[in-house]
């Protein structure tokens, strides 16, 4: 059976760039990384989180002041993996702009909201979903109680992060996240998860360097 990672890598387009030393080939994502664009795509888990964190740190080392653009299309995933990305976004010096393409659900929506103020965007047909954390555990009764308490602690912390980035009250966030809450791009703007819904890049800012405001 073929390795799915190998199959995927074989499908990634290569681009050729002319340099003073001749031609140089890059896979498309590496070429866009040169333009300080990071893709956060698919389920959030430890492997993906490590790659995103590494790219953020690399781009900070290259230029600690220049904006980093993060394109998000994710159904969410592991809370701790998402928080590793979130903490790194807040830790590094360059401002990180976020743009939702497709969907930003669960931890994806939190990372979308975590972009630099006035630099959080969504395309018009993207969908955003917020909810409280979920989990399961089996074992001794005492261990189950400990894990249940940890989920409650995580719920409280995630609510506080949403409060910080959306400007909503804690009660409003708690009510919104009680069940799966699906938002259109415009609803996400009104809720405070994004700052602007964009459908075109403005002519004066049209470049490969990321989703700057029109």
Curated annotation (Swiss-Prot):
Coiled-coil features, chain-numbered ranges: none
Protein location: Cytoplasm
Pfam families hit by this protein: CLP_protease (PF00574)
Chief place of localization: cytoplasm
Enzyme Commission number(s) of this protein: 3.4.21.92
CDD domains in UniProt: S14_ClpP_2
Gene3D superfamilies hit by this protein: 2-enoyl-CoA Hydratase, Chain A, domain 1
GO biological process: protein quality control for misfolded or incompletely synthesized proteins
UniProt keyword terms in alphabetical order: Cytoplasm, Hydrolase, Protease, Serine protease
Catalyzed reactions per annotation: Hydrolysis of proteins to small peptides in the presence of ATP and magnesium. alpha-casein is the usual test substrate. In the absence of ATP, only oligopeptides shorter than five residues are hydrolyzed (such as succinyl-Leu-Tyr-|-NHMec, and Leu-Tyr-Leu-|-Tyr-Trp, in which cleavage of the -Tyr-|-Leu- and -Tyr-|-Trp bonds also occurs)
Residues annotated as catalytic: 106, 131
Record's subunit section: Fourteen ClpP subunits assemble into 2 heptameric rings which stack back to back to give a disk-like structure with a central cavity, resembling the structure of eukaryotic proteasomes.
Listed name of the protein: ATP-dependent Clp protease proteolytic subunit
Organism listed in the record: Rhodopseudomonas palustris (strain BisB5)
Lineage: Bacteria, Pseudomonadati, Pseudomonadota, Alphaproteobacteria, Hyphomicrobiales
